[in-house]
Amino acid sequence: MDDHKPIETPDGPAVDTPGIGARRYETPPTELPITEAEAARAAGLAHNEHLKIASGYLRGGLADGLLKHATGAISEDDGQLVKFHGMYMQDDRDIRAERTKKKLEKAYSFMIRLRIAGGVVTPKQWLILDNIATTYAGSALRATTRQTFQYHGVIKSNLKRTMAAIDSALLDTIAACGDVNRNVMAATNPAQAGAHKIALQLAKDISDTLLPKTGAWREIWLDGERVVGGEDAAEVEPVYGKTYLPRKFKTVVAVPPSNEVDIFAHDLGFIAILDKKNRVTGWNVTVGGGMGMTHGESDTFPRTADVLGFVQPEDALKAAEAVMTVQRDWGNRKNRKNARLKYTIERFGLDAFRAEVEKRIGKKLGAPKPFTFDGNGDRYGWVEGEDGRHHLTLYVPSGRIKDIEGGPQFLSGLRRIAEVHEGDFRLTGNQNVIIANVPAGKRAEIDALVDEYGLTRGASALRRNSMACVALPTCGLALAESERYLPDLLSELEESLARHGLQDEPITIRSTGCPNGCARPFISEIGLVGRGPERYHLYLGAAFDGSRLSKLYREDVTASEIKGTLDPLFAAYAKDRQPGEHFGDFVIRAGFVAKTSNGPDFHERTGPLRAA
């Protein structure tokens, strides 16, 4: 990762940021008690801030809106609040024009996202989630890029039934979306059982500590006793306050040498520092990563996280709360496009941010400890852990767990496995599923079911390192296809790679339908970001381990032009690469594309530097 070292000037801290020259940071705000801070932010707030303040701790008009059976929708304002409850209101864009022509309401439905810290569920929970999918969500589950499940296509009249079923699995959807700390990811490396256990526990502890305390979720969705008038005088959010956070906040826990959680793409991260016996001795804390941006607005950009410092195990939770509450108090509540933690750090500087975090923890952070990542992909097939348990990673294209006509029967097959499995299931940040903690004596039974249902233990090197967001037809932000388009593109590129003898070369490729970056395309060696129907920006040059951003190589490339654009680069890579050199590193060294040091210079020196 590229380090940024602030320098002192007579007028205060400044940073030499590649591409934009030296600049001065803003002076951080004076810390206020949260109630005073809310009052101080009363002027000039973004609309969402007023919504949160007036919502009665996230109740709004949701309960009443569910009773309006004449429409499949809820109000626009409640559509913002319902995100905090773990769902988005969507419609089927494939039939939107047809329904408009017939003067019909849009085909509204809801995407529901679960909160599953670390992505681990039991076989019993899996079977309940499977039943929800077949009953309410079109017989499909989707493993997300952040280690949880999503249901698509749940209609309004089935929302409460779905939530009750989720609750019966001892799971929930609280804070899976919205301006809060969202689902906390954790390393899934099956070979490091001891470290994984500690990482998973930290993820769960952070999730519980930073969880909103409002009773609104249980009241609205499970018919819990409703407080008269919404909230009562005694109800508080001790960490968040009425305005919660300025924007989404994402936390991950990584265990080197694998970076499958993409730690540098998140607001807050903890990197396990291991001794020679793979025991966790503490955590490096990372801050300020994030993928989203807006096309054509150079003051928005993706950013890789900085390493803030080192904490002992007993201080990790304090550090998590301190980082989040500094963002709560310093983040931009007037412009949501610049509200993420990455912009807060760019405004005030890493040194000032670190000082405030240390103040809230009550002690200095240690110097960062050395660590090494070797990639951000999964390990497919069987892996034996330190404890003698066995783990089978299955490749699930775009995380879509459903039965495919003439192909793998993911939903049915994993249901059968859950009926006999004695361990647990783990979701990965790459949208795959691990059948975990299998006793040696059960491997043959699991293998037989995997074969019977055609489940995939792997695929080509390119497919194994690919990801796509949902995009069309359900995502309201999508500008282009992603999940439905990527398989065809991969087939084209596989042919090209094979022609150049690169069929076994791991290259990360990710696609998103818009620049919000849900599949983290800006830290993928090849990134496709939707611009319009069948048009994409093509990004190249990210690091294979996810530690360096890519650079815009070609604008508005049509779907039919992508293979032809990449083929000469593959040819050059096959001919001129150095031993062990990854594709993202090669295109920079060979002079095809400029290197991005970090977010502020992401939009500088774009385009091809020379012909391929």
Swiss-Prot record:
InterPro entries: CysI, NiRdtase/SiRdtase_haem-b_fer, Nit/Sulf_reduc_fer-like_dom_sf, NO2/SO3_Rdtase_4Fe4S_dom, NO2/SO3_Rdtase_4Fe4S_prot, NO2/SO3_Rdtase_4Fe4S_sf, NO2/SO3_Rdtase_FeS/sirohaem_BS. [4Fe-4S] cluster binds at residues 469, 475, 514, 518. One of its GO terms (biological process) is cysteine biosynthetic process. One of its GO terms (cellular component) is sulfite reductase complex (NADPH). Siroheme binds at residue 518. SUPFAM superfamilies: Nitrite and sulphite reductase 4Fe-4S domain-like (SSF56014), Nitrite/Sulfite reductase N-terminal domain-like (SSF55124). Pathway: Sulfur metabolism; hydrogen sulfide biosynthesis; hydrogen sulfide from sulfite (NADPH route): step 1/1. Binds 1 siroheme per subunit. GO terms for molecular function: 4 iron, 4 sulfur cluster binding; heme binding; metal ion binding; NADP binding; sulfite reductase (ferredoxin) activity; sulfite reductase (NADPH) activity. It comes from the Bacteria. Residues 1-26 are annotated as: Disordered. Its cofactor is siroheme; [4Fe-4S] cluster. Pfam families: NIR_SIR, NIR_SIR_ferr. It catalyses: hydrogen sulfide + 3 NADP(+) + 3 H2O = sulfite + 3 NADPH + 4 H(+). Keywords: 4Fe-4S, Amino-acid biosynthesis, Cysteine biosynthesis, Heme, Iron, Iron-sulfur, Metal-binding, NADP, Oxidoreductase. Its EC number is 1.8.1.2. Alpha(8)-beta(8). The alpha component is a flavoprotein, the beta component is a hemoprotein. Component of the sulfite reductase complex that catalyzes the 6-electron reduction of sulfite to sulfide. This is one of several activities required for the biosynthesis of L-cysteine from sulfate. Belongs to the nitrite and sulfite reductase 4Fe-4S domain family. HAMAP family: CysI. This is Sulfite reductase [NADPH] hemoprotein beta-component. It comes from Methylorubrum extorquens (strain ATCC 14718 / DSM 1338 / JCM 2805 / NCIMB 9133 / AM1). The gene is cysI.
